[in-house]
Amino acid sequence: MSLDSNPRIFTVSRLNAEVRLLLENEMGIVWLVGEISNLTVPVSGHWYLTLKDSQAQVKCAMFKGNNRRVNFKPQNGKQVLVKARLSLYEPRGDYQLIIESMQPEGDGRLQQEFDQLKMSLAAEGLFAQTAKKSLPEQPKRVGIITSQTGAALFDILHVLKRRDPNLPIVIYPTMVQGSGAAIQIAQAIGRANSRNECDILIVGRGGGSLEDLWCFNEEIVARTIAASEIPIVSAVGHEIDVTIADFVADVRAPTPSAAAELVSRDLSAQLQTVAHQKRRLNSAMERYLSHQQRSLSAYQHRIEKQHPQMQLNNQSQRLDDLNQRLMNHIQQRLQRQQYRVENLTLRLNNLSPTKRISQDKLHIEELKRRLLDSMDRNLLMQRHQLALAAEKLDTVSPLATLMRGYSITHNQDGKIITSTKQVELGDNITTRFADGDITSTVTKASELN
């Protein structure tokens, strides 16, 4: 036996490493059907198992990051379809498969049907965003299409009761698994549309295997959802479960509870928002009222300086002065006339002309009459002018307003009360009428709606 001149010599570890790279790079991803045996789950959370058929077997490993996405419980003896890459466990030189996904064997056929229907409906535009309907911001009534005995219904009702206990709910019970479930779901959606009593629908169920959820991948359900006039939220299984119904629905919720969150208002949050807005409104109103109060006080000060009563008092005083001056003038004139009469009488008495005296007496009487008439007319005119001035002033006088049945109410400090917010229970207030004042105690204060 002869050796080549330059043979390539491997160590065992080097050989295993190159074989591993060769398997991983050349073979790539493979799909494999087989029966589970020797399944073990150590504390690390990884799965170690053997896949076999009637003639051969292969060791497999499925690490924790991948096996947490498996939605069924693997068991020895169960037929499965796995997606894996070939590798080699170098320390022992064991050829093995690193499994990336696993599903029951029948799920492979179902997955193929799923992909074909998905492509067909997508080509028709049933998944397009332009075909989606907007969800109402504040639904008036929510319809739930699911099993009447399933956990999904309990979860949805629990969330709706917590967030918006007054929201009306209509339940359209239906099968959500097994033969005939797809037809019942489509009929329930059609019934909800024909009754037109809800403005949003939740269609869904809890988690399960691909076979359990298959009714939501049926074409009849997809087309019924697409044709619905009422917006539909799909809520099928868990977040990792994706169905044809999710693509066709107007909105997809990862879980039934999440769907209930989507379609309901958070009443407590809204109440907090209303309370915040109320506080802001009250603060703004207080600032506005404070500003108006300052403006009112300034106006009141200006009005008091120009009050009609003050003007009336000034005019009345002026009229009194004019009247006094008039009376003095008349008195002086009378005195002068009286003096003249006395002087003429003296002269007449000295001259003793009877006829002249008689004539002068008549003339004097005439002058006296005319003077008195003039005085009466002048006095009447002055009184008339005084009455007109008083009448004009009376039209703007607060006393005239009081005479018409109005009143003015002051607090204990003498400030005018214009609002029920300016008084407290037990305050003493004074109300002025045209003929006097009334003092009273506040026992009730209410605002007009």
From Swiss-Prot:
Keywords, alphabetical: Cytoplasm, Exonuclease, Hydrolase, Nuclease
Single GO term (MF): exodeoxyribonuclease VII activity
CDD domains: ExoVII_LU_OBF (cd04489)
Entry keyword annotation includes Zinc: no
Catalyzed reactions per annotation: Exonucleolytic cleavage in either 5'- to 3'- or 3'- to 5'-direction to yield nucleoside 5'-phosphates
Segments passing through the bilayer: none
UniProt GO cellular component terms: cytoplasm; exodeoxyribonuclease VII complex
InterPro entries from the UniProt entry: Exonuc_VII_L, Exonuc_VII_lsu_C, OB-fold_nuc-bd_dom
Gene Ontology biological process terms, A to Z: DNA catabolic process
First-level EC class: hydrolase
Record's keyword annotation contains Cytoplasm: yes
Domain of life: Bacteria
Similarity comment: family membership: Belongs to the XseA family.
Its biological purpose: Bidirectionally degrades single-stranded DNA into large acid-insoluble oligonucleotides, which are then degraded further into small acid-soluble oligonucleotides.
Subunit comment: Heterooligomer composed of large and small subunits.
Database matches in PANTHER family: EXODEOXYRIBONUCLEASE 7 LARGE SUBUNIT (PTHR30008:SF0)
Protein name per UniProt: Exodeoxyribonuclease 7 large subunit
Organism encoding this protein: Aliivibrio fischeri (strain ATCC 700601 / ES114) (Vibrio fischeri)
Recorded name of the encoding gene: xseA
